[in-house]
Amino acid sequence: KSIPDAVILAFNTLIVKNWNGLASAFKQSDVIAYIASDNITEEEAIKNHWLDVEPIYRANGFGVKYVGRGSDAEFTFWKA
């Protein structure tokens, strides 16, 4: 199953919102809160691997780091 547009939009929005000029960092719980407005649950997103966006962003010129576990985990994006 491909990643829904709503999930990509959530990541794009959070990257822009948290951009400090060099990188953007935010918690997985921020993504979950954003996609909840599209009726996508945390369980559904995790079960379907919809938060595994790293390859998409790496293919589009970003570096991506994912640290931690669960809702406290943090994504960091930067221009590679």
Map each language-model feature to its residues.
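An N-terminal amphipathic alpha-helical segment
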Residues: K1-E43
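Short amphipathic alpha-helical interaction segments
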Residues: I46-P55
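C-terminal edge-of-domain segments
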Residues: I56, G61-A80
